[in-house]
């Protein structure tokens, strides 16, 4: 067996999916795609504007379409998804059927610290009040966890763990 053609990184906003994805793609000599960046490129809008002007339902449909397009690409790739992508439509099943899914299970304290710095670029987080951010993020995590747990592998964002998992998938 060889390394899966597509490797999908899933997890909460601020978990480090994009950072780890870039590192992993470089190590494996593959293209890297950030699902949110691809959505923005194709829509011609930034995600906060899509949420604000058109709504989350439209965004989720667009997200599903772009994810499906990336799955169908005829090239090996590492794909960092948006935090909610695995939780809508049959996205997680699609990803599991197309390659390896890796849940980046970063400690909540680290996630909160990161999203506070980038709150305005994260529509769901931006709606949360600062004094209840930790509680709201914890609730969001609990809601999404059953979807994330369908991943092939879970790590706390350690590149070496991911590489070892992929190496073991080869044998």
Feature-to-residue mapping (PLM):
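Post-Walker A helix-loop "phosphate-sensing" segment adjacent to the P-loop in P-loop NTPases
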Residues: 26-37, 45
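Hydrophobic positions on the alpha1 helix immediately C-terminal to the Walker A/P-loop
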Residues: 20
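ATP-dependent small-molecule kinase phosphotransfer cores
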Residues: 37-96, 121, 138
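NTP-dependent small-molecule kinase module
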Residues: 2-4, 27, 142-171
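A glycine- and Lys/Arg-enriched "phosphate-lid" helix/loop adjacent to the NTP-binding pocket
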Residues: 98-143
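P-loop (Walker A) phosphate-binding loop of NTP-binding proteins
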Residues: 12
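Conserved lysine of the Walker
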Residues: 17
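Hydrophobic anchor at the beta1->P-loop junction of P-loop NTPases
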Residues: 9
């Amino acid at each position: 067996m060889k390394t899966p053609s597509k490797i999908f990184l899933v997890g909460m906003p601020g978990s480090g999916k994009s950072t780890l994805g870039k590192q992993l793609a470089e190590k494996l000599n593959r293209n890297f795609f950030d699902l949110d960046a691809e959505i923005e490129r194709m829509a011609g809008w930034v995600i906060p504007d899509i949420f604000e002007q058109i709504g989350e339902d439209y965004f989720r449909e667009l997200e599903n379409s772009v994810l499906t397009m990336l799955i169908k690409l005829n090239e090996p790739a590492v794909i960092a998804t948006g935090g909610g992508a695995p939780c809508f439509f049959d996205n997680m099943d699609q990803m599991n059927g197309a390659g390896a899914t890796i849940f980046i299970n970063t400690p909540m304290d680290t996630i909160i610290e990161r999203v506070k710095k980038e709150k305005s670029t994260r529509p769901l987080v931006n709606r949360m009040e600062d004094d209840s951010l930790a509680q709201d993020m914890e609730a969001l995590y609990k809601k999404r966890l059953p979807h994330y747990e369908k991943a092939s592998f879970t790590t706390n964002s350690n590149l070496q763990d991911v590489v070892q998992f992929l190496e073991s998938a080869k044998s």
